[in-house]
Amino acid sequence: TPHSPPMEALNAKVADAATKSIVHYSFYFGATTTNPDIVPTLDKNRVCGVKLFMGASTGNMLVDRMEVLRKVFANAGILIAAHCEEQSIISANTTAFKEKYGEDPDIKYHPQIRSAEACVYSSSLAIRLAKENNARLHILHISTAQELDLFEDKPLSEKKITAEACVSHLYFYDKDYEALKGHIKCNPSIKTLEDRNALRKALSTNRIDVIQSLIHITEPTRPEPI
């Protein structure tokens, strides 16, 4: 619930799960630019990690100020799960594509606006901060071949920095926008065939540690049920 204050939202989720869940559960604490001082106070037995959006996201959860990022990485005694896209690159691309194609550029340009460059830059920064602070980092939904080179090909038990791939990035590539339009619009964007194939190949190595089954689709409308 990004629109709620993170601690309030966390408490609400825990209370709701307590009445409904039949399995063990835990939730992320959502880091924002205004709450990094709460991070070191989190109960490790209650919170599974800190969710960090290093790029455009929903509501107030974008964290793009370096001093805040440094605080989070220095003080988090639990896992940091990071969505990595560099906002300044996305903003510049958005402006350029709107100037060229109008206020609402075609969906096929989505992977060029939310580009591979934005992902690689942000993931590289997250990994650098994690190494500087000996933090436990998990980078969510890797979408480019270049990012794979940032991760070590060794057993999970020997790593503090891990990565995941999402089914949407493993299945689709940019040419699919022509037929599927906004139904495959997600962040990070679905990119090239080369990126998709590199992600698939990485599944047989130790560079990808987790396969995520679902990523939020950003298209605001859905087709009616048949």
Question: What do the PLM-derived regions correspond to, one by one?
Answer:
Residues 1, 27-29, 140, 211-213:
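Active-site neighborhood of phospho(di)ester-bond hydrolases with catalytic His/Asp-centered motifs
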Residues 1-20:
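Metal-associated gating/positioning segment near the N- to mid-region
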Residues 3-6, 62, 147, 226:
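Alpha-helix N-cap/helix-start motif
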Residues 16-30:
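A glycine-rich helix N-cap at a beta->alpha junction
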Residues 31-36:
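Active-site beta->alpha loop and helix N-cap motifs at the rims of alpha/beta catalytic domains
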Residues 215-226:
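Single conserved hydrophobic/aromatic residue that forms the stacking wall/gate
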